[in-house]
Amino acid sequence: MKAFKTRIYPNAEQTVLIEKTFGCCRFVYNNGLECKIDAYKKDKTNLSAYDLIKRITTLKKEFEWLKEVELHTLQQSILDLEKAYKNFFREHKGFPKFKKKGDKDSFRTFNMRFVSRHFIYLPKIGAVKIAEKIKKKWSIHNATISKRAGKYFISLLIDYESPKVQKTGEVVGIDLGIKTFATLSDGTKYENPKTLSKYEDKIARYQRQLSRTQKGSNNRKKVKEKLARLHLKVSNIRQDYLHKMSREIANRYSFVAIEDLNIAGMVKNHNLAKSISDCSWGEFVRMLEYKCSWYGCELRKIGRFEPSSKLCSNCGYKMNEIPLNIRKWTCPNCGTHHDRDVNAAINILNIAQEK
């Protein structure tokens, strides 16, 4: 399956209905979270998703406006809450929080259909114009409507048959870095676009303007929208670069080796946190994983504690320490001259192939 995301253009009436759906889903989610917390405090009872879904009928009688939203969409809010609880207990993620208006507004629907190549029908909302042409042969599992920086988007989960790509049998190791985003074992280098740093001054200017506005004022709302649009622009530029790079690698190679980095631990270094976050290594690896599966490429990760930078890829000699500012070095054992990043990428490939 594949997710296809594009912008939609609801009319004024549809915009109101979408905003109502956001609000109703948020209400049901928060009500379910409150019920689960209260039940556990009272007698250690853990209300199931089934228990909370049954309560939706009662809520509809008490709050008539909930009837304006499709039942399946409201039920999905409860399933999202259940997933958040499971993530908390099983994967040690943060405890579920109450949702606020404007905080990643979204909802999921299932009973949609294509009206034409430019319109998609959404239950209780109608036929909404879509930015990109749709292939009618697509089999859609669900659709997620979201809002960001005042713009509306739809993400369709569709059945996807991976294209058959003629592979050459090439193998490659990848070393991720800050100055150079990715260095491949064959010497190919992808520079870090440093997307955030290019817009940092403008972001800071908007943030200063925001701090000087009064809460609840129209000026504050306008500045917040400008800031949100700028953050969206930065995100889109970064995503586009990562998509192109990951697709190129997955398309070209038959075997890819990469280091399993502890990104959460690395961002604790306050000197490098902003640069690491701007790189979005985790997002790149995520993209590479699913694209490798599409294009018939094997992806293998090596342990984060492997000494990939300290080993001579020619003779295996291990250096005691190589400071970060040293970008090129010569092996004292065999005399091979190394580019630090290329050498690390070769070692990552060698270690992965030995497994």
Task: Give a label for each model feature.
Residues Y50-R148:
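Acidic carboxylate diad motif detector
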Residues A39-K54, E91, K164-T168, R212-R220:
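Short, glycine- and charge-enriched coil/turn segments that flank and shape catalytic ligand pockets
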Residues A3-K5, K136, K147-K355:
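Positively charged, helix-rich recognition surfaces that bind polyanionic ligands
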Residues Y29-K36, Y85, F89-H92, L210, ...:
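A generic secondary-structure signal for well-formed alpha-helical elements
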Residues M1-L74:
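Gly/serine-rich nucleotide phosphate-binding loop at the start of the catalytic core
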Residues N46, Y50, H72-Q75, L79, ...:
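An alpha-helix initiation/capping motif
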